[in-house]
Amino acid sequence: MGNKKALKEEAFLGSAEEGADFDQAMFPVMETFEINDPMPKKRNWGSFCTAVMAIHLILLTAGTTLLTLKVLSLQKWILEKYLDNETLAAEDRSFFSLQLASPETHLVPRTPGLQALQVQLTQVRTSQEQLLQQVDNLTRNPELFRIKGERGSPGIPGLQGPPGIKGEAGLQGPMGAPREPGATGAPGPQGEKGSKGDKGLIGPKGEHGTKGDKGDLGLPGSKGDMGMKGVTGVMGPPGAQGNKGDPGKPGLPGLAGSPGVKGDQGQPGLQGVPGTPGAAGPSGAKGEPGHPGPPGPTGPQGISGSPGAAGLKGSKGDTGIQGQKGTKGESGVPGLAGRKGDTGNPGLAGPKGEPGRPGLKGDPGMKGSSGQQGQKGEKGEKGQSFKEVRIVGGTNRGRAEIFYNNAWGTICDDNWDNNDATVFCRMLGYSSGKGFTFGGGSGNIWLDDVNCQGTEDSLWNCRKNNWGSHNCNHNEDAGVECR
Protein backbone atom coordinates (compact mmCIF):
# COMPACT_ATOMS: atom_id res chain seq x y z
CA MET A 1 0.00 0.00 0.00
CA GLY A 2 2.85 2.35 0.85
CA ASN A 3 4.64 1.58 -2.48
CA LYS A 4 1.45 2.30 -4.40
CA LYS A 5 1.03 5.67 -2.70
CA ALA A 6 4.69 6.51 -3.34
CA LEU A 7 4.32 5.66 -7.08
CA LYS A 8 1.19 7.84 -7.32
CA GLU A 9 2.95 10.72 -5.60
CA GLU A 10 6.00 10.44 -7.91
CA ALA A 11 3.76 10.29 -11.00
CA PHE A 12 1.83 13.34 -9.83
CA LEU A 13 4.99 15.30 -9.07
CA GLY A 14 6.36 14.34 -12.51
CA SER A 15 3.23 15.61 -14.24
CA ALA A 16 3.39 18.78 -12.13
CA GLU A 17 7.01 19.34 -13.15
CA GLU A 18 6.13 18.81 -16.83
CA GLY A 19 3.33 21.37 -16.46
CA ALA A 20 5.73 23.78 -14.80
CA ASP A 21 8.27 23.28 -17.64
CA PHE A 22 5.53 23.92 -20.18
CA ASP A 23 4.45 27.06 -18.34
CA GLN A 24 8.04 28.27 -18.10
CA ALA A 25 8.45 27.63 -21.81
CA MET A 26 5.16 29.32 -22.62
CA PHE A 27 5.36 32.37 -20.37
CA PRO A 28 8.82 33.58 -21.47
CA VAL A 29 7.43 33.70 -24.97
CA MET A 30 4.55 35.73 -23.62
CA GLU A 31 6.88 37.94 -21.62
CA THR A 32 9.06 38.68 -24.64
CA PHE A 33 6.15 40.42 -26.18
CA GLU A 34 6.70 44.10 -25.60
CA ILE A 35 3.80 46.44 -25.44
CA ASN A 36 5.76 49.38 -26.76
CA ASP A 37 7.01 47.69 -29.91
CA PRO A 38 7.63 50.23 -32.65
CA MET A 39 4.70 50.36 -35.01
CA PRO A 40 5.44 49.07 -38.46
CA LYS A 41 4.69 51.37 -41.25
CA LYS A 42 2.64 48.77 -43.06
CA ARG A 43 -1.02 49.38 -43.63
CA ASN A 44 -2.15 45.86 -42.45
CA TRP A 45 -1.13 46.53 -38.79
CA GLY A 46 -4.68 46.11 -37.50
CA SER A 47 -5.07 42.59 -38.94
CA PHE A 48 -1.68 41.61 -37.51
CA CYS A 49 -2.71 42.77 -34.02
CA THR A 50 -5.95 40.84 -34.31
CA ALA A 51 -4.05 37.68 -35.26
CA VAL A 52 -1.64 38.13 -32.34
CA MET A 53 -4.54 38.61 -29.93
CA ALA A 54 -6.23 35.49 -31.29
CA ILE A 55 -3.04 33.47 -30.82
CA HIS A 56 -2.70 34.76 -27.26
CA LEU A 57 -6.30 33.88 -26.48
CA ILE A 58 -5.83 30.39 -27.93
CA LEU A 59 -2.68 29.86 -25.86
CA LEU A 60 -4.42 31.25 -22.79
CA THR A 61 -7.35 28.89 -23.31
CA ALA A 62 -5.00 25.93 -23.75
CA GLY A 63 -3.06 26.85 -20.61
CA THR A 64 -6.27 27.25 -18.61
CA THR A 65 -7.55 23.88 -19.86
CA LEU A 66 -4.28 22.18 -18.97
CA LEU A 67 -4.34 23.81 -15.54
CA THR A 68 -7.92 22.63 -14.98
CA LEU A 69 -6.98 19.07 -15.92
CA LYS A 70 -4.05 19.15 -13.53
CA VAL A 71 -6.26 20.48 -10.73
CA LEU A 72 -8.85 17.73 -11.36
CA SER A 73 -6.17 15.04 -11.40
CA LEU A 74 -4.73 16.51 -8.20
CA GLN A 75 -8.18 16.46 -6.61
CA LYS A 76 -8.70 12.82 -7.58
CA TRP A 77 -5.27 11.86 -6.26
CA ILE A 78 -5.85 13.62 -2.94
CA LEU A 79 -9.28 11.99 -2.57
CA GLU A 80 -7.71 8.55 -3.13
CA LYS A 81 -4.72 9.22 -0.84
CA TYR A 82 -6.13 11.12 2.11
CA LEU A 83 -9.89 10.45 2.10
CA ASP A 84 -11.13 6.92 2.86
CA ASN A 85 -14.75 7.78 2.10
CA GLU A 86 -15.03 8.38 -1.67
CA THR A 87 -18.75 9.22 -1.60
CA LEU A 88 -18.33 12.98 -1.62
CA ALA A 89 -21.03 14.99 -3.32
CA ALA A 90 -20.34 16.84 -6.55
CA GLU A 91 -20.81 20.23 -4.92
CA ASP A 92 -18.32 19.29 -2.22
CA ARG A 93 -15.76 18.26 -4.85
CA SER A 94 -16.22 21.52 -6.76
CA PHE A 95 -15.78 23.45 -3.55
CA PHE A 96 -12.70 21.38 -2.82
CA SER A 97 -11.28 22.17 -6.25
CA LEU A 98 -11.80 25.88 -5.59
CA GLN A 99 -9.95 25.49 -2.31
CA LEU A 100 -7.08 23.83 -4.17
CA ALA A 101 -6.86 26.80 -6.56
CA SER A 102 -6.87 29.30 -3.68
CA PRO A 103 -3.49 30.59 -2.45
CA GLU A 104 -4.58 29.93 1.17
CA THR A 105 -4.63 26.14 0.77
CA HIS A 106 -4.21 24.18 3.99
CA LEU A 107 -3.89 20.61 2.61
CA VAL A 108 -1.55 18.61 4.73
CA PRO A 109 0.98 21.40 5.31
CA ARG A 110 3.36 18.99 6.99
CA THR A 111 4.00 16.94 3.74
CA PRO A 112 7.11 18.26 1.86
CA GLY A 113 5.82 17.04 -1.53
CA LEU A 114 2.51 18.87 -1.13
CA GLN A 115 4.29 22.04 -0.01
CA ALA A 116 6.42 22.04 -3.15
CA LEU A 117 3.32 21.35 -5.26
CA GLN A 118 1.48 24.20 -3.54
CA VAL A 119 4.35 26.57 -4.36
CA GLN A 120 4.27 25.52 -8.03
CA LEU A 121 0.48 25.98 -8.22
CA THR A 122 0.82 29.43 -6.71
CA GLN A 123 3.47 30.35 -9.29
CA VAL A 124 1.24 29.05 -12.12
CA ARG A 125 -1.69 31.07 -10.82
CA THR A 126 0.45 34.21 -10.56
CA SER A 127 1.73 33.74 -14.11
CA GLN A 128 -1.84 33.26 -15.34
CA GLU A 129 -2.95 36.50 -13.68
CA GLN A 130 -0.01 38.34 -15.25
CA LEU A 131 -0.94 36.90 -18.67
CA LEU A 132 -4.57 38.01 -18.29
CA GLN A 133 -3.41 41.45 -17.24
CA GLN A 134 -1.12 41.74 -20.30
CA VAL A 135 -3.93 40.66 -22.65
CA ASP A 136 -6.24 43.17 -21.02
CA ASN A 137 -3.62 45.87 -21.46
CA LEU A 138 -3.28 44.94 -25.15
CA THR A 139 -7.01 45.28 -25.72
CA ARG A 140 -7.11 48.63 -23.92
CA ASN A 141 -3.86 50.13 -25.27
CA PRO A 142 -4.82 53.27 -27.26
CA GLU A 143 -1.47 53.27 -29.09
CA LEU A 144 -2.59 50.23 -31.06
CA PHE A 145 -5.24 52.41 -32.60
CA ARG A 146 -2.87 55.42 -32.86
CA ILE A 147 -4.82 57.19 -30.10
CA LYS A 148 -2.88 58.50 -27.15
CA GLY A 149 -4.84 57.76 -24.06
CA GLU A 150 -4.70 59.27 -20.61
CA ARG A 151 -2.23 58.03 -18.10
CA GLY A 152 -3.71 55.19 -16.09
CA SER A 153 -3.88 55.06 -12.32
CA PRO A 154 -1.28 52.98 -10.53
CA GLY A 155 -2.24 49.32 -10.22
CA ILE A 156 -3.02 47.47 -7.06
CA PRO A 157 0.13 46.09 -5.47
CA GLY A 158 0.47 42.40 -6.10
CA LEU A 159 0.21 39.72 -3.46
CA GLN A 160 3.33 38.91 -1.56
CA GLY A 161 4.95 35.83 -2.97
CA PRO A 162 5.75 32.79 -0.84
CA PRO A 163 9.15 32.76 0.85
CA GLY A 164 11.85 31.19 -1.25
CA ILE A 165 13.53 27.93 -0.34
CA LYS A 166 16.67 28.35 1.71
CA GLY A 167 19.73 28.10 -0.52
CA GLU A 168 22.57 25.67 0.05
CA ALA A 169 25.53 26.74 2.10
CA GLY A 170 28.40 28.21 0.05
CA LEU A 171 31.89 26.73 -0.13
CA GLN A 172 34.31 27.71 2.58
CA GLY A 173 36.78 30.35 1.43
CA PRO A 174 40.57 29.76 1.47
CA MET A 175 42.41 30.50 4.65
CA GLY A 176 44.05 33.92 4.70
CA ALA A 177 47.80 34.43 4.93
CA PRO A 178 49.12 34.83 8.46
CA ARG A 179 49.79 38.40 9.52
CA GLU A 180 52.26 39.80 11.95
CA PRO A 181 50.78 40.35 15.39
CA GLY A 182 49.70 43.92 15.91
CA ALA A 183 50.83 46.16 18.70
CA THR A 184 49.32 45.58 22.09
CA GLY A 185 46.34 47.84 22.54
CA ALA A 186 45.82 50.09 25.50
CA PRO A 187 43.90 48.49 28.36
CA GLY A 188 40.22 49.24 28.14
CA PRO A 189 38.30 51.02 30.86
CA GLN A 190 37.14 49.01 33.82
CA GLY A 191 33.76 47.46 33.22
CA GLU A 192 30.75 48.24 35.31
CA LYS A 193 29.96 46.10 38.30
CA GLY A 194 27.89 43.14 37.26
CA SER A 195 24.43 42.55 38.62
CA LYS A 196 23.89 40.06 41.39
CA GLY A 197 23.65 36.54 40.07
CA ASP A 198 20.64 34.31 40.49
CA LYS A 199 20.28 32.29 43.63
CA GLY A 200 22.01 28.95 43.36
CA LEU A 201 20.20 25.63 43.52
CA ILE A 202 19.63 24.05 46.90
CA GLY A 203 22.36 21.57 47.67
CA PRO A 204 21.70 17.90 48.40
CA LYS A 205 20.49 16.94 51.84
CA GLY A 206 23.30 16.05 54.20
CA GLU A 207 23.62 12.70 55.91
CA HIS A 208 22.03 12.14 59.31
CA GLY A 209 24.37 12.81 62.20
CA THR A 210 25.27 10.12 64.72
CA LYS A 211 22.98 9.74 67.71
CA GLY A 212 24.32 11.50 70.80
CA ASP A 213 25.14 9.70 74.06
CA LYS A 214 22.47 9.48 76.73
CA GLY A 215 22.77 12.22 79.33
CA ASP A 216 23.62 11.50 82.99
CA LEU A 217 20.78 11.01 85.43
CA GLY A 218 20.01 14.18 87.36
CA LEU A 219 20.46 14.41 91.14
CA PRO A 220 17.31 13.90 93.24
CA GLY A 221 15.79 17.08 94.57
CA SER A 222 16.28 18.04 98.21
CA LYS A 223 13.46 17.58 100.72
CA GLY A 224 11.55 20.74 101.51
CA ASP A 225 11.40 22.19 105.06
CA MET A 226 8.38 21.24 107.14
CA GLY A 227 6.14 24.13 108.07
CA MET A 228 5.79 25.31 111.71
CA LYS A 229 2.94 23.88 113.75
CA GLY A 230 0.39 26.36 115.00
CA VAL A 231 0.31 27.24 118.75
CA THR A 232 -2.51 25.73 120.81
CA GLY A 233 -4.42 28.21 122.96
CA VAL A 234 -4.34 28.12 126.81
CA MET A 235 -7.12 26.03 128.31
CA GLY A 236 -9.42 27.93 130.66
CA PRO A 237 -9.83 27.00 134.38
CA PRO A 238 -12.35 24.28 135.15
CA GLY A 239 -15.76 25.44 136.35
CA ALA A 240 -17.53 24.44 139.57
CA GLN A 241 -19.27 21.11 139.58
CA GLY A 242 -22.98 21.46 139.07
CA ASN A 243 -25.85 19.30 140.19
CA LYS A 244 -26.39 16.04 138.46
CA GLY A 245 -28.70 16.65 135.59
CA ASP A 246 -31.06 14.38 133.77
CA PRO A 247 -29.49 12.02 131.30
CA GLY A 248 -28.99 14.00 128.14
CA LYS A 249 -29.09 12.96 124.58
CA PRO A 250 -26.06 11.22 123.18
CA GLY A 251 -23.35 13.77 122.58
CA LEU A 252 -21.71 14.51 119.33
CA PRO A 253 -18.75 12.38 118.39
CA GLY A 254 -15.52 13.68 119.82
CA LEU A 255 -12.74 15.12 117.79
CA ALA A 256 -10.30 12.75 116.27
CA GLY A 257 -7.05 12.44 118.12
CA SER A 258 -3.85 13.68 116.58
CA PRO A 259 -1.98 11.01 114.65
CA GLY A 260 1.01 9.50 116.35
CA VAL A 261 4.58 10.01 115.30
CA LYS A 262 5.73 7.71 112.55
CA GLY A 263 8.05 5.06 113.91
CA ASP A 264 11.26 3.87 112.37
CA GLN A 265 10.89 1.35 109.63
CA GLY A 266 11.56 -2.14 110.90
CA GLN A 267 13.33 -4.88 109.07
CA PRO A 268 11.07 -6.95 106.84
CA GLY A 269 10.00 -10.10 108.66
CA LEU A 270 9.39 -13.51 107.25
CA GLN A 271 6.19 -13.97 105.35
CA GLY A 272 3.55 -15.25 107.73
CA VAL A 273 0.55 -17.37 107.10
CA PRO A 274 -2.24 -15.20 105.70
CA GLY A 275 -4.71 -14.59 108.51
CA THR A 276 -8.30 -13.55 108.47
CA PRO A 277 -8.80 -9.91 107.46
CA GLY A 278 -9.17 -7.69 110.53
CA ALA A 279 -11.34 -4.66 111.01
CA ALA A 280 -10.31 -1.58 109.07
CA GLY A 281 -8.27 0.76 111.26
CA PRO A 282 -8.11 4.54 111.01
CA SER A 283 -6.11 5.88 108.12
CA GLY A 284 -2.63 6.95 109.15
CA ALA A 285 -0.91 10.17 108.24
CA LYS A 286 0.66 10.44 104.84
CA GLY A 287 4.25 9.29 105.04
CA GLU A 288 7.17 11.29 103.86
CA PRO A 289 8.30 10.41 100.35
CA GLY A 290 11.31 8.14 100.44
CA HIS A 291 14.39 8.50 98.32
CA PRO A 292 14.13 6.69 95.02
CA GLY A 293 15.87 3.36 95.28
CA PRO A 294 17.42 1.39 92.46
CA PRO A 295 14.87 -0.60 90.46
CA GLY A 296 14.76 -4.24 91.48
CA PRO A 297 14.76 -7.11 89.01
CA THR A 298 11.40 -7.92 87.52
CA GLY A 299 10.19 -11.24 88.89
CA PRO A 300 7.95 -13.70 87.10
CA GLN A 301 4.27 -13.07 87.42
CA GLY A 302 2.74 -15.24 90.09
CA ILE A 303 -0.38 -17.26 89.57
CA SER A 304 -3.42 -15.54 91.00
CA GLY A 305 -4.49 -17.22 94.25
CA SER A 306 -7.98 -17.98 95.39
CA PRO A 307 -9.78 -15.22 97.29
CA GLY A 308 -9.67 -15.65 101.08
CA ALA A 309 -12.74 -16.41 103.14
CA ALA A 310 -14.64 -13.46 104.54
CA GLY A 311 -13.90 -12.74 108.20
CA LEU A 312 -16.52 -13.01 110.93
CA LYS A 313 -18.34 -9.85 111.83
CA GLY A 314 -17.34 -8.59 115.24
CA SER A 315 -19.90 -8.12 118.01
CA LYS A 316 -21.06 -4.64 118.87
CA GLY A 317 -19.42 -3.16 121.94
CA ASP A 318 -21.30 -1.86 125.03
CA THR A 319 -22.36 1.74 125.04
CA GLY A 320 -20.31 3.82 127.46
CA ILE A 321 -21.83 5.82 130.36
CA GLN A 322 -22.70 9.36 129.42
CA GLY A 323 -20.49 11.83 131.23
CA GLN A 324 -21.81 14.80 133.20
CA LYS A 325 -22.05 18.02 131.34
CA GLY A 326 -19.83 20.67 132.83
CA THR A 327 -20.49 24.37 132.86
CA LYS A 328 -18.75 26.42 130.28
CA GLY A 329 -15.81 28.27 131.75
CA GLU A 330 -14.93 31.82 131.04
CA SER A 331 -12.69 32.46 128.16
CA GLY A 332 -9.16 33.06 129.35
CA VAL A 333 -6.87 35.78 128.22
CA PRO A 334 -4.84 34.52 125.29
CA GLY A 335 -1.30 34.02 126.42
CA LEU A 336 1.89 34.82 124.64
CA ALA A 337 3.01 32.48 121.98
CA GLY A 338 5.28 29.92 123.60
CA ARG A 339 8.16 28.09 122.09
CA LYS A 340 7.52 25.04 120.06
CA GLY A 341 7.10 22.19 122.49
CA ASP A 342 8.51 18.73 122.23
CA THR A 343 6.47 16.13 120.53
CA GLY A 344 4.13 14.55 123.06
CA ASN A 345 3.38 10.92 123.51
CA PRO A 346 0.68 9.62 121.23
CA GLY A 347 -2.71 9.94 122.87
CA LEU A 348 -5.45 7.40 122.91
CA ALA A 349 -7.42 7.08 119.73
CA GLY A 350 -10.60 9.09 119.99
CA PRO A 351 -13.94 8.07 118.56
CA LYS A 352 -14.19 8.15 114.82
CA GLY A 353 -15.36 11.53 113.61
CA GLU A 354 -17.60 12.33 110.70
CA PRO A 355 -15.89 12.07 107.34
CA GLY A 356 -14.45 15.41 106.37
CA ARG A 357 -14.59 17.02 102.99
CA PRO A 358 -12.24 15.51 100.45
CA GLY A 359 -8.98 17.42 100.43
CA LEU A 360 -7.15 18.70 97.41
CA LYS A 361 -5.18 16.18 95.45
CA GLY A 362 -1.63 16.09 96.74
CA ASP A 363 1.50 16.16 94.66
CA PRO A 364 2.56 12.74 93.41
CA GLY A 365 5.15 11.23 95.72
CA MET A 366 8.50 9.94 94.58
CA LYS A 367 8.64 6.33 93.53
CA GLY A 368 9.53 4.09 96.44
CA SER A 369 12.05 1.30 96.39
CA SER A 370 10.97 -2.00 94.95
CA GLY A 371 10.12 -4.55 97.64
CA GLN A 372 11.48 -8.04 97.83
CA GLN A 373 9.80 -10.59 95.64
CA GLY A 374 7.23 -12.63 97.49
CA GLN A 375 7.04 -16.38 97.47
CA LYS A 376 5.03 -18.02 94.76
CA GLY A 377 1.50 -18.71 95.94
CA GLU A 378 -0.37 -21.91 95.43
CA LYS A 379 -2.51 -22.27 92.37
CA GLY A 380 -6.12 -21.42 93.12
CA GLU A 381 -9.07 -23.46 92.08
CA LYS A 382 -10.73 -22.56 88.82
CA GLY A 383 -13.81 -20.45 89.42
CA GLN A 384 -17.00 -20.73 87.45
CA SER A 385 -17.71 -17.69 85.30
CA PHE A 386 -21.27 -16.52 85.04
CA LYS A 387 -22.78 -16.83 81.57
CA GLU A 388 -25.52 -14.50 80.38
CA VAL A 389 -26.98 -17.17 78.09
CA ARG A 390 -27.61 -20.90 78.49
CA ILE A 391 -28.88 -23.95 76.61
CA VAL A 392 -31.76 -25.81 78.27
CA GLY A 393 -32.39 -29.44 77.29
CA GLY A 394 -28.87 -30.50 76.32
CA THR A 395 -25.18 -29.69 76.39
CA ASN A 396 -24.89 -28.06 72.96
CA ARG A 397 -28.44 -28.46 71.60
CA GLY A 398 -31.61 -27.18 73.17
CA ARG A 399 -33.72 -24.12 73.94
CA ALA A 400 -31.89 -20.77 73.93
CA GLU A 401 -32.41 -18.71 77.10
CA ILE A 402 -30.94 -15.35 78.15
CA PHE A 403 -30.48 -13.72 81.58
CA TYR A 404 -31.90 -10.19 81.91
CA ASN A 405 -33.23 -8.12 84.81
CA ASN A 406 -32.21 -10.84 87.34
CA ALA A 407 -34.36 -13.45 85.60
CA TRP A 408 -33.99 -16.04 82.85
CA GLY A 409 -36.20 -15.83 79.77
CA THR A 410 -36.61 -17.25 76.27
CA ILE A 411 -36.16 -15.82 72.76
CA CYS A 412 -38.90 -15.73 70.09
CA ASP A 413 -38.10 -17.53 66.82
CA ASP A 414 -39.27 -14.64 64.59
CA ASN A 415 -36.36 -13.92 62.16
CA TRP A 416 -34.20 -16.36 64.18
CA ASP A 417 -31.54 -17.77 61.81
CA ASN A 418 -28.03 -19.23 61.80
CA ASN A 419 -26.36 -15.79 62.18
CA ASP A 420 -28.29 -15.17 65.41
CA ALA A 421 -27.50 -18.70 66.64
CA THR A 422 -23.78 -18.21 65.84
CA VAL A 423 -23.62 -15.06 68.00
CA PHE A 424 -25.51 -16.90 70.79
CA CYS A 425 -23.08 -19.85 70.65
CA ARG A 426 -20.06 -17.51 70.53
CA MET A 427 -21.13 -16.15 73.94
CA LEU A 428 -20.77 -19.75 75.26
CA GLY A 429 -17.34 -20.31 73.68
CA TYR A 430 -18.42 -22.10 70.49
CA SER A 431 -17.44 -21.00 67.00
CA SER A 432 -20.72 -21.44 65.08
CA GLY A 433 -24.34 -22.37 65.58
CA LYS A 434 -27.56 -23.40 63.87
CA GLY A 435 -30.95 -21.89 64.68
CA PHE A 436 -34.35 -23.63 64.79
CA THR A 437 -37.64 -23.64 66.75
CA PHE A 438 -37.54 -25.60 70.03
CA GLY A 439 -40.50 -24.41 72.18
CA GLY A 440 -41.51 -25.62 75.64
CA GLY A 441 -40.24 -22.68 77.65
CA SER A 442 -41.85 -20.77 80.52
CA GLY A 443 -41.58 -17.42 82.20
CA ASN A 444 -40.46 -14.27 80.40
CA ILE A 445 -39.94 -13.92 76.65
CA TRP A 446 -37.17 -11.33 76.60
CA LEU A 447 -36.28 -10.94 72.90
CA ASP A 448 -38.10 -10.90 69.55
CA ASP A 449 -37.07 -10.11 65.94
CA VAL A 450 -33.34 -10.58 66.63
CA ASN A 451 -31.34 -9.61 63.51
CA CYS A 452 -27.59 -10.29 63.87
CA GLN A 453 -24.99 -10.05 61.09
CA GLY A 454 -23.00 -12.98 62.48
CA THR A 455 -19.90 -10.94 63.39
CA GLU A 456 -21.08 -9.55 66.74
CA ASP A 457 -19.66 -10.75 70.07
CA SER A 458 -22.94 -10.57 71.98
CA LEU A 459 -26.69 -10.46 71.38
CA TRP A 460 -26.65 -7.07 73.11
CA ASN A 461 -24.89 -5.67 70.00
CA CYS A 462 -27.49 -7.01 67.53
CA ARG A 463 -30.59 -5.27 66.24
CA LYS A 464 -33.71 -6.40 68.09
CA ASN A 465 -36.96 -5.24 69.65
CA ASN A 466 -37.03 -3.70 73.10
CA TRP A 467 -36.51 -6.08 75.98
CA GLY A 468 -39.79 -7.85 76.81
CA SER A 469 -41.57 -6.55 73.66
CA HIS A 470 -42.85 -9.53 71.61
CA ASN A 471 -45.90 -11.10 69.95
CA CYS A 472 -45.04 -14.78 70.54
CA ASN A 473 -45.97 -17.74 72.73
CA HIS A 474 -43.65 -20.30 74.30
CA ASN A 475 -44.37 -22.78 71.53
CA GLU A 476 -42.28 -20.40 69.35
CA ASP A 477 -39.21 -20.39 71.62
CA ALA A 478 -35.95 -20.40 69.64
CA GLY A 479 -33.44 -23.25 69.84
CA VAL A 480 -29.74 -23.57 68.97
CA GLU A 481 -27.25 -26.25 68.09
CA CYS A 482 -23.71 -25.07 68.86
CA ARG A 483 -20.60 -26.50 67.18
Swiss-Prot record:
Tissue and organ expression note: Expressed in alveolar macrophages, macrophages of lymph node sinues, and Kupffer cells in liver (at protein level).
Ranges annotated as spanning the membrane: 49-69
PTM characteristics: N-glycosylated.
Keyword RNA-binding: no
Highest taxon, organism lineage: Eukaryota
Pfam families in the record: Collagen, SRCR
GO molecular function: G protein-coupled receptor binding
Subunit structure: Homotrimer; disulfide-linked. Trimers may assemble in larger oligomers thus resulting in the creation of a large surface capable of interacting with very large ligands.
Key words, A-Z: Cell membrane, Collagen, Disulfide bond, Glycoprotein, Immunity, Innate immunity, Membrane, Receptor, Signal-anchor, Transmembrane, Transmembrane helix
Protein name (Swiss-Prot/TrEMBL): Macrophage receptor MARCO
Keyword Disulfide bond recorded: yes
Spans within the Cytoplasmic topological domain: 1-48
Region of interest called Disordered, as start-end residue ranges on this chain: 146-386
Disulfide-bonded cysteines: C412-C472, C425-C482, C452-C462
Gene3D superfamilies: SRCR-like domain
